[in-house]
Amino acid sequence: PMYLGGQSKETGRVYIYKVGQLLLTSNGTLRADKKPQDSRFGYSLAAVPDLNHDGFNDVVVGAPLEDGHRGAVYVYHGSRGTILPQYQQRIEASSLHPSLSYFGRSVDGQMDLDGDELVDLAVGAQGAAVVLRSRRIVQVNASLAVHPASINVLQKNCPRHGQDSVCVTATVCFRATSRSPGRGDRHFGIEYSVALDDRKFGARAVFDDTSQKLVQKRLRASVGRAACQPLPFHVIDTTDYLRPVSVTVTFALSDSDPGPVLDERSATTVKKLIPFFKDCGEDNECVTDLVLQASMDLAGS
């Protein structure tokens, strides 16, 4: 913890050594905040049971002098045979309570303190102890289905704003799974945005309820069940029939929800392209068959 870094600051450092049969071998260092400051990173250290439920134990490191002696703790995930050097989470004292100081002077995490079958973390500070509750981790798979599968501008199937239009319904579904133990906190909120033709300046399609090409939505989901929502839109008259219309969904778990958190490896964007109907056969591949015939007519010959 007394290691001197840049500008002669007591930044601290944690070295990783691998235990062998005869000796210890160096296996790198743990990376903390790069800002030169008195930190005493490594003042406290705890090996904790698997916090992210990937099958490997993790490490928590305290840095009680960071942020002007307010303090912080770092969470590092374990991997096969080592510890990942880049921290996965930095928890600042200032984000918890304005009066905390020397947060991270001691750390411990071996027990479930709130009865949800997850190991929680206890962190010592000046005149205080803070319990950090673990949260479940969910993997969310988003999918898009579109009906009809292509846009036929010659078959306008619905009236919109006083004129016949081509209407399409995109249905987004979210399916959640979890590798965390126990059954609590299985319900959570999802906030998502849907964009039509997200890279184009002019709108070729808009949503029925807003007449805009971008909408913000939210829904409630639960582990083990699919949560779906229809998104009806219609196509505006356009001269660009070559490039397909894109539907892009970007989502995140609701920040205001105290339930589970999203697995950092989960993709948060799904995109689908809806082509225009070309009437080019079963393979939808149009092959041009243009023939040019020329004749010469010389006047006066």
What residues fall within each predicted segment?
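Conserved beta-strand/short-helix segments
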Residues: P1-S301
